[in-house]
């Protein structure tokens, strides 16, 4: 059973108002769950860094107009909005620092968390294993059922298009083998879920009655 602990509830309560745009609130919670699962498999990581970072990583999008926000991450983007991705990282780091200090997180941890958030999308390498898990959790979310539904809504895609787009971004760019295995399993389930054969199973037919 995964639940937010006392520290993470305190962080979440302060972060939530900054995440109430473009489904970032639900995205961050699902990514938190993914991070918790990865932490059980990667003993060298520090949950005191990873979990606050994943809850706070997208708070900076609150400082960007939502329409421009989507243009910055669209699959057909032309690069003219790339500066907004950087802005959300910088502003997210600023917001995260303020929240972490209010919660009373140790200064040494604050510095590590903020460093991860500042560059979590644009930095192509991982600073360390904690950064790798944050990056991977963020990306693996894309191939969850929630992630695919959100991407469909954002960009007007059908289920197959969303799955192909999300799958392309949620494997090769991952840093940990554990996240790659998780992503591959989620993609496999999504593929089976869309098959004609599954649609004709008793349980599916029974559910429609």
Regions found by a protein language model. Give the residues of each.
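Divalent metal-dependent phosphate-bond-processing catalytic cores, especially two-metal-ion Mg2+/Mn2+ enzymes
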Residues: 1-3, 19-29, 33-45, 56, ...
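Active-site flanking loop/helix segments enriched in acidic
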Residues: 6-30, 69-83
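Conserved acidic
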Residues: 23, 47, 84, 88
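An active-site-proximal "capping" alpha-helix that borders the catalytic cofactor pocket
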Residues: 30-34, 38, 86-102
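Acidic/histidine metal-binding catalytic segments
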Residues: 42-52, 101-117, 130
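His-Asp-centered metal-binding catalytic motifs of divalent-metal-dependent phosphohydrolases/nucleases
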Residues: 47-76, 92, 112-122, 138
């Amino acid at each position: 059973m995964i639940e937010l602990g006392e520290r993470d509830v305190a962080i979440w309560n302060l972060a939530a108002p900054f995440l109430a745009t473009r489904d970032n609130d639900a995205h961050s919670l699902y990514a938190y769950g993914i991070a918790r699962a990865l932490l059980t498999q990667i003993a060298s990581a520090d949950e005191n860094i990873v979990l606050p970072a994943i809850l706070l990583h997208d708070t900076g999008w609150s400082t960007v107009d939502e329409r421009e926000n989507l243009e910055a991450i669209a699959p057909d983007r032309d690069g003219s909005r790339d500066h907004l991705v950087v802005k959300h990282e910088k502003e997210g780091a600023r917001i995260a620092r303020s929240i972490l200090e209010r919660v009373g997180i140790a200064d040494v941890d604050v510095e590590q968390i903020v460093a991860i958030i500042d560059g979590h999308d644009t930095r192509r390498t991982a600073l360390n294993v904690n950064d790798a898990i944050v990056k991977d959790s963020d990306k693996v979310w894309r191939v969850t059922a929630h992630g695919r539904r959100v991407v469909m809504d954002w960009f007007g895609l059908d289920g197959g298009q969303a799955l192909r787009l999300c799958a392309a971004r949620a494997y090769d760019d991952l840093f940990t083998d554990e996240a790659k295995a998780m992503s591959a399993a989620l993609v496999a389930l999504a593929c089976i879920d869309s098959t004609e054969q599954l649609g004709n199973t008793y349980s599916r037919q029974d559910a429609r009655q």
